């Protein structure tokens, strides 16, 4: 039995929730997010709160209810406050710039790397070696950050590459003679 699923998701003022079967739509000041919930989960909307429980006949009902609760809680936080992810570029000549919805990266290749951002994600560069991603969809922000990091992962000897701001890169010792 999931302890996570037992806690209701409180819906703050200014957030609108539409429940249509297993499709839930949450709208707030930062946009609108829609998600289809697993058939094993029963959702009830009452008193500015969403409650979750398993449907009869499903073995993994409580597990799916806990997952659904966590996803919908992230959606509510996303449309009210939003999510941010910070990336750092470490290395000589590594630079980033944002033009519209395209992130331009100079990562030591013979060509610049242009990454187009999906709808709902915005990026800004406070400095040439920092990228800040903002948006309402937690999963999409993480995916875009992982895609940008994948162009040049931090290497284990000098730590050069694209890394998350809170990431600790373990470096190896150089070869001894």
From Swiss-Prot:
Alphabetically ordered keywords of this record: Ribonucleoprotein, Ribosomal protein, RNA-binding, rRNA-binding
InterPro entries (UniProt xref): Ribosomal_uL6-like, Ribosomal_uL6-like_a/b-dom_sf, Ribosomal_uL6_a/b-dom, Ribosomal_uL6_bac-type, Ribosomal_uL6_CS
GO MF, any single term: structural constituent of ribosome
Listed GO CC annotations: cytosolic large ribosomal subunit
GO biological process, one term: cytoplasmic translation
Keyword Manganese on entry: no
Short name of any one Pfam family annotated for the protein: Ribosomal_L6
Ribosomal protein as UniProt keyword: yes
Lineage: superkingdom: Bacteria
HAMAP family, sorted: Ribosomal_uL6_B
Oligomeric and partner information: Part of the 50S ribosomal subunit.
Function summary: This protein binds to the 23S rRNA, and is important in its secondary structure. It is located near the subunit interface in the base of the L7/L12 stalk, and near the tRNA binding site of the peptidyltransferase center.
Family recorded in the similarity comment: Belongs to the universal ribosomal protein uL6 family.
Name of the protein in question: Large ribosomal subunit protein uL6
Native source organism of the sequence: Edwardsiella ictaluri (strain 93-146)
Gene, per the UniProt record: rplF
